[in-house]
Structure formats: C-alpha cells, structure tokens
Amino acid sequence: MFTSLHTPILHPRYCHHPTPSCTQFSPLALPPFHRTLSFLAPPPLLPAAPALSAASAAKPDKSGEQKWVHEGLIMESLPNGMFRVRLDNEDLILGYISGKIRKNYVRILPGDRVKVEVTRYDSSKGRIVYRLRSSTPS
C-alpha cells in the first residue's frame, strides 16, 4: 500500500536503525526556535525591529494644520452648541463648542469671553476651545 513517497520521516532520536528516511531529517538544519522539546510550548519571541508606537501612528500631526487663535465675545446662542462670536478684530463668526468643553459641561452664555481657533481655510467658522474667566467676581 505504501510507496516510498508515503514513508514517514522519523526523528533521529526515536529511529534505532539508520534508514534513508531517518538520516535525511536533521534537527540542526532548522532555525534555533524550532528546536523545542515540547510541541506544546510556543517558540520564544524574537526581538522585533523598532517601530512607531501605536499612539503616534494613529494620530495625525497636529502641528501641520495652521490655526489662528483669537479671543472674542459671545453675542448670540444658537441651537446645537453653536454661537455667534464677535472677535476682537471686529469679525463676526459662527463658533461651535469643542469636544472637551462639551464633555465637561462648560456653560457658555451670551456675554462670555472665549478663545476661538479659526482655520485658515474657512475664516467664517471657528471652534470655541476655552471660556475665559470673568474679571469681576460674581
């Protein structure tokens, strides 16, 4: 039934008589991590080449985006966290709340002074990133 192609390759440790099938297998020909005594033990980890960390690979470069930071006064409150903001240079823009301000439930009311990031691509909209504290105690 079995031909020469179907003869099993035996390990030299368990082969007690030298046959061509026993002598053709050499454990020293394999890389060192394949020479484990137990087939259940995983091969040892090899040192990996230094790579970029996951945090730096996931986030885009923030310094590449040019933004202007202006201070302004909230003129009008609009729906969905949008505000009319009068900047110090007398421009009137549409400001929306940043995620940190939304997450921390910072209250912004008309008359508050805020810091706004305005992108250079659309200077009519900006992100409100900070609510400035009022100078008068109330």
Curated annotation (Swiss-Prot):
Q: What is its main location?
A: plastid
What are the annotated GO cellular component locations? Answer: chloroplast; cytosol
The reply on keyword Protein biosynthesis is yes
Name it.
Translation initiation factor IF-1, chloroplastic
Ordered alphabetically, the record's keywords are:
Chloroplast, Initiation factor, Plastid, Protein biosynthesis, Transit peptide
Q: Which Pfam families does the entry link to?
A: eIF-1a
Q: Which family does it belong to?
A: Belongs to the IF-1 family.
- Kindly give the InterPro entries that the UniProt entry links to this protein: NA-bd_OB-fold, RNA-binding_domain_S1_IF1, S1_domain, TIF_IF1
Query: By its UniProt entry, which SUPFAM superfamilies does this protein fall under?
Result: Nucleic acid-binding proteins
Q: Where is the signal peptide?
A: none
The UniProt subunit note reads as follows: Component of the 30S ribosomal translation pre-initiation complex which assembles on the 30S ribosome in the order IF-2 and IF-3, IF-1 and N-formylmethionyl-tRNA(fMet); mRNA recruitment can occur at any time during PIC assembly.
* Function, in words: One of the essential components for the initiation of protein synthesis. Stabilizes the binding of IF-2 and IF-3 on the 30S subunit to which N-formylmethionyl-tRNA(fMet) subsequently binds. Helps modulate mRNA selection, yielding the 30S pre-initiation complex (PIC). Upon addition of the 50S ribosomal subunit IF-1, IF-2 and IF-3 are released leaving the mature 70S translation initiation complex.
Q: Localized where?
A: Plastid, Chloroplast
Name any one GO molecular function: ribosome binding
**S1-like domain: which residues?**
58-133
Q: Where is the transit peptide?
A: 1-53
UniProt-listed CDD domains:
S1_IF1
